[in-house]
Amino acid sequence: AAPDVMSAVLALEPASHVVELDDDYLDDIAAAFGQVVDSKSPYTSGHSARVALYTDLIAETLGLAPERRRWLKRGALLHDVGKLGVSNSVLDKPGKLDAEEWAAVQAHAAYTEAILSRIGAFAELAVVSAAHHERLDGKGYPRGLTAEQITLETRIITTADIFDAITAERPYRGAIPIPKTLEMMAENVGTAIDPVCFEALKQAIARLPA
């Protein structure tokens, strides 16, 4: 349960931070967190790593500086860490979720922010990563942010996350081919998906080897 996850995080938090962490070490920590989250369910295997890859490809296409791309890639690896607080019976459910189950799934975004905000090296990423289910039309969660409140970095992670969620196999359906995925995403450009990030995604995907 989420309170147990939070208790564990707080218990591990030192009284003072005296260790200087280099970028390579932070990359490794973020990747390890992502692997732990992804191993929670067979349907999320590799998800965080793929979202990080697509995030970096979009960021590169948009011309973000290398150091900013590296920072943002960590945010993508960590975006679903809050799912450690959501029951597998909900995450792996093949049918439609009821209201209580859907609320439990939505809570993972707030858990992500709570967990990352307690880790000094990742505190700056807490809001950026946790907001990946916010929408430009204000109908997202956990805060219902409007377009002007959603950073470019979050918009990039959101675009990458949606792309992987559709192209990956789910409990209730098989994987959807990339052309069909892009068609489905295009219907949500301007409401859930940033148009600039979507165009960058398409350009990035076109550059990938077949």
Briefly describe each language-model feature range:
Residues 1-210:
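Metal-dependent catalytic cores of enzymes that make or break cyclic nucleotides
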